[in-house]
Regions:
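Polar/charged alpha-helical tracts
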Residues: 2-10, 60, 81, 89-94, ...
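Short extracytoplasmic/periplasmic juxtamembrane "stem" segments immediately C-terminal to an N-terminal membrane anchor
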Residues: 45-46, 125-142
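Solvent-exposed soluble domains appended to multi-pass membrane proteins
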Residues: 141-438
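Transmembrane and membrane-interface helices of multi-pass
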Residues: 1-126
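Short linear sequence motifs
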Residues: 117-118, 127, 132, 276
Length: 438
């Protein structure tokens, strides 16, 4: 019996050290990796499917959170086993166990305080307990209004740009930097398309509000006008449909006979995107898994979150031409990924225009790729009857790229509509990523 208690005691102290260590290192890892996210995003991704997550993120957690926790627990267990074999070391074992446990508990308390303060965890739970009339006062259910289709149905190409901000332009154009990292996108917004900037001559963009500050939430916001709350993230991992009660752009266009497709360079299951788009408009899902299963990329090929944007744009051209060859109008939606935090993915097309600033180089490369893609679209016969929407999904979560921006500067996602009908409105609009559907 004494031996059993001895074994259980060693197991208990090991498990305690592992759990406390994991909590501490997980919070430290989160605060270092995700410096610019909100607690609702953390909760959302805790419940969303892990399938499709960038393996770099998983390995980072393993090395920086799980491994040190296991080492502490293993060291403490080993120490207990070795010292408890010696009769004169029993008191020392107890002192060590109490001391280590005390250090871990105090460290957990300090880390938890810093974590809660950084992510306003208390405010998050206070908000959960309060009701809000925001949706009731501002959301218009598409089912309650008369939507009249135009005489000639127009094609829609909706390009979600990962973490793309109007912020990345130069100060003279309405951005926050001395350099313009997105000259082509800036030109589209100020000289060719509509960014709802009125007569300001400056870039205008969309605010990222609660429930739309991460990719899945942002895509739901822009296509449904609703926030993707954490309980929806939970449902996305267990249900065949995502937000079943919502009416989205996909639902509306499906009723009008549109062929629809979603193209992403990652696993569309991640964040519930596959469920959402297939359940709202019966989109064809062309993602990383589809590309591999159908020979677009070699078996086992994987960079970044799946495959890089250089391939994404090539696949987009093929898919759009296929859609355009059919008699029905089409809605082609795509999402880039190279500009995802941390620091983005440097592909073969990227130039070292900004030495020592990888993220700036990746953003500049994305700007160039989008430009070449849009210019290709303009040369196609279907373009005259096609509207292009280019929007950042949310502001970047990169840990340091925007650190030196003036606190008074209001960061917004990039947004422009090309070849719009009717023409650009004269008035300036102050809008969020919930508004494009309107």
């Amino acid at each position: 019996m004494k031996k059993v208690r001895h074994i259980l005691g060693i197991i208990g102290i090991g498990v305690l050290a592992l759990v406390l260590g994991l909590l501490i290192f997980a919070m430290l890892w989160t605060m270092d990796i995700w410096r610019h996210i909100t607690f609702d995003e953390i909760v959302y991704h805790l419940f969303a499917p892990i399938k499709g997550t960038n393996p770099d993120v998983i390995w980072s957690f393993i090395f920086r959170a799980l491994t040190p926790s296991l080492l502490i627990a293993a060291a403490l267990v080993t120490l207990n086993i070795v010292l408890k074999k010696k009769a004169n070391k029993q008191k020392l074992v107890k002192i060590i166990n109490v001391a280590v446990s005390l250090v871990l508990v105090v460290s957990l308390g300090i880390t938890t305080f810093c974590f809660c303060n950084k992510y306003d965890v208390v405010g998050y739970f206070q908000n959960i307990g309060e009701s809000s009339d925001f949706i009731q006062d501002n959301y218009v259910d598409p089912n309650t209004v008369v939507l009249q289709a135009p005489g000639e149905q127009r094609n829609l190409i909706y390009i979600f740009l990962e973490s793309m901000e109007a912020t990345y332009s130069d100060k003279d154009s309405g951005g926050a930097y001395d350099d313009n990292y997105i000259p082509n996108l800036t030109n589209y917004a100020l000289n060719e398309g509509c960014c709802f900037n009125g007569s300001t001559g400056k870039l205008n963009g969309a605010l990222s509000l609660h429930g739309a500050t991460f990719t899945s939430g942002a895509m739901v916001a822009q296509t449904a006008g609703l926030p993707a709350m954490e309980e929806v993230g939970n449902a996305a991992g267990t249900q065949d449909t995502f937000y079943p009660g919502a009416t989205t752009i996909g639902d509306i266009l499906a009723k009008e006979g549109y062929n629809q497709e979603l193209l992403v360079g990652s696993d569309a299951v991640f964040g519930g995107r596959a469920q959402y788009f297939s359940g709202h408009g019966n989109y064809k899902i062309f993602d990383y898994v589809y590309a591999m299963e159908n020979g677009y990329i070699p078996q086992g090929y994987k960079v970044w979150w799946g495959y890089e944007d250089e391939k994404l744009f090539d696949f987009a051209k093929q898919e759009i031409l296929d859609l355009a060859s059919k008699p029905e109008p089409f809605n082609f939606t795509m999402l880039t990924v190279d500009t995802h935090f941390e620091d983005g993915w440097v592909c073969d097309l990227c130039e070292d225009k900004y030495p020592g600033n990888q993220y700036a180089n990746v953003i500049s490369c994305s700007d160039k790729q989008v430009y070449e893609f849009v210019e290709w679209i303009k040369t196609q016969e279907f373009y005259e009857n096609t509207t292009i929407v280019i929007c950042g999904d949310h502001i970047t979560m990169d840990s340091n790229f925007c650190e030196k921006i003036e606190p008074s500067y209001e960061r917004k996602t990039f947004c422009v509509i090309l070849n719009a009908v009717p023409a650009e409105p004269a008035e300036e609009r102050y809008f969020s990523t919930f508004d494009p559907i309107s």
